[in-house]
C-alpha cells in the first residue's frame, strides 16, 4: 500500500535511485496505490550525470509492494521492498533495463514493455 510521502526504490536504470510518492493517479482522493497503479513522484536520490535529476517530478508505475497481493486463485505474493519503474506520459519505461521480479498483473494492465524487460515475472 503506497500513499503520499512513501519512499520507493527505483527498479530500472533510468538514473533515479529513490522516489517519494506525492500523488496517486486515477481518482481525486484515492488513499492507497497498489501494484500496477501509476503515481506522481519526486526524485529524492539520483545517479550523477544522468538525464533525471534530484527534485524532478516524474510518473512511475508500481511494480513491487511489501503489502500482500492476493490473486483470484488464492495465491498471495509479497515482496521485500516497495519499488517502481519510471515511465513517460505514454506509459513507456524511461530506462532500458528492469531489475528484480515483477508481478504478472502488469501484463494485464498493458505495461507489456516493462514485463518484457523484466528478468523474472511472478
From Swiss-Prot:
GO terms for cellular component: chloroplast; large ribosomal subunit. It is found in: Plastid, Chloroplast. It holds the Pfam family Ribosomal_L14. Keywords: Chloroplast, Plastid, Ribonucleoprotein, Ribosomal protein, RNA-binding, rRNA-binding. InterPro entries: Ribosomal_uL14, Ribosomal_uL14_bac-type, Ribosomal_uL14_CS, Ribosomal_uL14_sf. Disulfide bonds: none annotated. Part of the 50S ribosomal subunit. Belongs to the universal ribosomal protein uL14 family. This is Large ribosomal subunit protein uL14c. It comes from Citrus sinensis (Sweet orange). The lineage of its organism: Eukaryota, Viridiplantae, Streptophyta, Embryophyta, Tracheophyta.
